[in-house]
From Swiss-Prot:
It is a multi-pass membrane protein. Belongs to the MntP (TC 9.B.29) family. This is Putative manganese efflux pump MntP. The gene is mntP. PANTHER family: MANGANESE EFFLUX PUMP MNTP-RELATED. InterPro entries: Mntp/YtaF, Put_MntP. HAMAP family: MntP_pump (MF_01521). The chain crosses the membrane at residues 5-25, 38-58, 67-87, 107-127, 133-153, 164-184.
């Protein structure tokens, strides 16, 4: 196997880890996800992990310094808000039905927030004058697989540990946001 292909696969796995963590969280907090909703998670995370390097590549160096300073803050605040909301919902027993709801809005926000690193990788691809098709395809496929795997593993953990696992899920999202913020 070509060393550049190995490098792309390693990058894809690294980029997919945030999507995996979020999917794991969703798996153990949203126990009633249907197969089609699980597929949506994989498709959304895979699509945004695929498209963000393309957008980063297009932006290239023209606005990279501005974007690289603002993007982590956007991801942090999105994940912080969603994480705090999950914790609040888990502590409010009257709102238990909200925990199991599926939301395209939340899914989109999570997919965007976890793909900020992929955007930065796209800027790097532009600086290295790399082609995009193969790396972006691999990144998207790996994110898709990791997201779906995360949900299934999370569902198993959620069944084992119970409903209050949502507090941990919210904390995980907040920690991912902090990691993104500190990584820049």
């Amino acid at each position: 196997m070509d060393t550049s292909l190995i490098s792309i696969i390693i990058i894809a796995i690294a980029l997919a880890m945030d999507a995996f963590s979020v999917s794991l969280t969703k798996g153990f907090t949203q126990k009633n996800l249907t197969k089609s909703q699980i597929l949506y998670y994989g498709l959304f995370f895979g699509f945004f992990q695929f498209i963000m390097p393309v957008i980063g590549y297009i932006c290239g160096t023209t606005i990279s310094s501005f974007v690289s300073t603002v993007a982590p803050w956007i991801a942090f605040f999105l994940l912080l808000a969603i994480g705090l909301n999950m914790i609040r919902e888990s502590l409010d027993s009257d709102d238990e039905y909200i925990m199991d709801t599926f939301s395209f809005k939340e899914l989109t926000l999570l997919a965007v927030a976890t793909s900020i690193d992929a955007f930065a990788v796209g800027i790097t691809f532009a600086l290295l004058n790399m082609s995009l098709l193969l790396p972006c395809t691999i990144i998207g496929i790996v994110a898709f697989i990791f997201s779906i795997s995360g949900i299934f593993i999370g569902k198993k953990l959620g069944n084992y540990f119970g409903d209050k696992f949502e507090i941990l899920g919210g904390a995980v999202l907040i920690l991912i946001g902090i990691k993104i913020l500190l990584g820049y």
